Amino acid sequence: MSDHKIKNKESLLSHGDAGAKAQVLELTERVLQRLDARKRLHEMMHREGSELVIGRRRHDLSRYRHVYAFSSGKAGNHMARAFEDLLGEYLTLGVTIIKLRDEEDVYRKTEVYVGGHPLPNEEGIRGCQRMIDIAEQMGPDKMVLSLTWAAAVPN
């Protein structure tokens, strides 16, 4: 499993000014690594026992019978994996709507829907409906965490 964001580096360097391209690709790789949604979420939140710490706020996950995690957008897969990492056994179910399925992504408790962009498709609509169905059943013993990558929000 490669942790590199640029998957076709060799192909890009195989023609033209390889030295200049290598510098640009190295810088681009570093920027993409820094912007990785999974890594960023781990920087912004962590768990201490049963408490999920987000910034200065603490949420005792043991108070909830069910904890759900929703994510959507191009980084939906990375956000879903971060939710699974962070919530662990407290996660009841995750639902994510992504643009592309990545073979490196392995989920334990997350339903994955591949949505259309810029126009919605049937699978994306099913993912939205799944989130709505869960949200309609919410009560004081349930928690939902939801993150949307910018491109998933209509302008």
Can you say where each PLM-predicted feature lies in the sequence?
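Non-transmembrane, aqueous-exposed alpha-helical and coiled segments at domain scale
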Residues: 2-155
